Structure formats: structure tokens, C-alpha cells
């Protein structure tokens, strides 16, 4: 059996108010697998995604991404992951093109206007590339978030609450 792309072992998260969001989670995800996490509000789905992405630290347990530990090898693991958050988090006064291009740099990727153009065309946003984000509809803003998540060419993509908004 090949090594897991994402390996979660005995992962727990207890917040400062003693709320247990995750308790002894074990999960292995192989390359090419597509999974969906379903559960009620407060079940820990976003917490799990946030830990894998390095946004929240676990209380205990380990997570590896492509063999790299999410804590010890933070930059390496984070560069492999694209995240489309559940909340609209965009630079409102920037253009679509600049917003997506800027995201590449956050992951140490050199500018690549051709790659950004391809993503924007694939998401039917190319004709909006020079428009400020404040002028876009909610659905278009969601697509910009997807473009940002894909801009640094990750091998893993998380969609947190993809139907929200």
C-alpha cells in the first residue's frame, strides 16, 4: 500500500474554554481520493481542515501531508494545500487578477501570469480580471476564492462549506 497523502493519527483539539472539538481522529487519505465530511454545526469539520492547513494547532496527535509533519514542516505542507474558506476573505479594493496573483507569492511561487490567466479562464472570470472585487456578485467572489486557492498549484484542495453564501 502506498503512503497516504494525508495521514491523521490520534488527533484531538480542546479549545481554551475546554470545548472538545476533535477527539482521537484517525484518517488516511490517498492520492486521488475525493472525500466529503458531513456533520452538524459544531461537529469539528472546519477545525479538522484548519489543523491540516496549519491555521489551528492540535492539542495532541499528528498530521502529515505527503510525508511532511504539519508543525515541523509547516511551509512545505502549506505549499501543498489550497484552501477555499467558508467566509469571503478577499482584498475588496484589488482587482481579480491582482488578488489571485498575490496569492502565488504568499507561497513563495514566482509570478506566472499565464497560469493565473488559465485559472481565471477555467473559472469564467477572465473577462472580470480588471474589475475590483467589490463589484462582483457573491458567486463570482466564491470563484475568485477558488482561483486564489489554485494559484500556487497545490496538490490538495480543501473546500470548507462550498455551498455557503
Where are these regions (language model features)?
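Conserved ABC ATPase signature
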Residues: 132-136
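Conserved catalytic motifs of ABC-family nucleotide-binding domains
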Residues: 153
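Conserved ABC transporter NBD signature motif
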Residues: 61-69, 77
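Catalytic Walker B motif of ABC-type/P-loop ATPase nucleotide-binding domains
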Residues: 157-160
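Conserved ABC ATPase "signature" region
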Residues: 101, 105-128
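Walker A (P-loop) phosphate-binding loop of ABC-type ATPase nucleotide-binding domains
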Residues: 40-44
Amino acid at each position: 500500500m502506498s503512503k497516504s497523502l494525508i495521514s491523521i493519527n490520534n488527533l484531538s483539539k480542546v479549545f481554551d474554554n475546554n470545548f472538545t472539538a476533535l477527539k482521537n481522529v484517525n484518517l488516511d487519505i490517498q492520492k486521488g481520493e475525493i472525500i466529503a465530511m458531513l456533520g452538524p454545526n459544531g461537529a469539528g469539520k472546519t477545525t479538522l481542515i484548519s489543523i491540516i492547513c496549519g491555521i489551528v494547532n492540535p492539542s495532541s496527535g499528528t498530521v502529515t501531508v505527503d510525508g511532511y509533519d504539519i508543525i515541523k514542516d509547516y511551509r512545505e505542507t502549506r505549499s501543498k494545500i489550497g484552501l477555499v474558506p467558508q467566509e469571503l476573505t478577499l482584498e475588496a479594493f484589488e482587482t481579480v487578477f491582482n488578488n489571485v496573483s498575490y496569492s502565488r507569492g504568499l507561497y513563495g511561487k514566482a509570478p506566472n501570469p499565464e497560469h493565473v490567466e488559465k485559472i481565471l479562464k477555467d473559472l469564467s472570470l477572465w473577462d472580470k480580471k480588471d474589475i475590483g472585487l467589490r463589484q462582483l456578485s457573491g458567486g463570482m467572489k466564491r470563484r475568485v476564492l477558488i482561483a486564489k486557492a489554485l494559484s500556487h498549484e497545490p496538490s490538495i484542495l480543501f473546500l470548507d462549506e462550498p455551498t455557503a453564501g
